[in-house]
């Protein structure tokens, strides 16, 4: 069993406990949370609660997460672009085209397979299919990920994500010309009822906030920096489509292919967090991958 501690904020006042926990960065489903509440594994301010409990600001919520079913993950030696590593955390620059963790039908060739060969220990809180994984980026998105090498680090990093103190900045190329230099997209994201493999903005979705800043404008495209306040599945891709500026090359949320680029033009370039052991803020920056830098240069040449 592993314990996760979460402090409720003012903006979460009066949310049901199951909705509150399902909206955190832990990728828990509401059904999963409801079962844990029923089993007495969710405690608020030291006492077990029922599923209809309404969150109050400052509530100290403790979730006891059961151990996952044991499954074997193959350790595969591979070249990893590691930016930082110590006894607690590892920061790796994931290439475009690599899946983060194994899943049914895709059990090898993932970042986790490579990490299992590189590290002797990784945290076990997220289960054996996702050891050490605190957050994810999509297969065709490149960039920085933080990995927990023990459960202490994992709990610290997850709590920082929940409390929105982790810096996550992405560089993206989007279709169209954004007229204003800065903006915030505050729109809940949930599973698309018509296509369960896609996400969409929906009233009953999870809270999602993205801030963006225009870096450069081209003839028919805009280069932007997007900063995540939350971390929903496909968040930047869904949010930019929602405001009318889908990512260039995005096969799922973009228009029909109008640009020569393999996958969405999105790179997780900046990652910052408080070190779990020392409390010191650390920040890392990964340059654009060659294919995305070339795309931007070509757009620049074309005006």
Curated annotation (Swiss-Prot):
Gene Ontology BP terms: enzyme-directed rRNA pseudouridine synthesis
Keyword annotations from UniProtKB, A to Z: Isomerase, RNA-binding
SUPFAM superfamilies, A to Z: Alpha-L RNA-binding motif (SSF55174), Pseudouridine synthase (SSF55120)
Record-listed E.C. numbers: 5.4.99.-
Matches recorded under InterPro entries: PsdUridine_synth_cat_dom_sf, PsdUridine_synth_RluA-like_CS, PsdUridine_synth_RluC/D, PsdUridine_synth_RsuA/RluA, RluA_PseudoU_synthase, S4_RNA-bd, S4_RNA-bd_sf
Domain S4 RNA-binding: 15-74
Catalytic residues in the record: 138
Single GO term (MF): pseudouridine synthase activity
Reactions listed under catalytic activity: a uridine in RNA = a pseudouridine in RNA
Enzyme class: isomerase
NCBIfam families: rluA_subfam
Family named by the database record: Belongs to the pseudouridine synthase RluA family.
The protein, known as: Uncharacterized RNA pseudouridine synthase YlyB
Gene source species: Bacillus subtilis (strain 168)
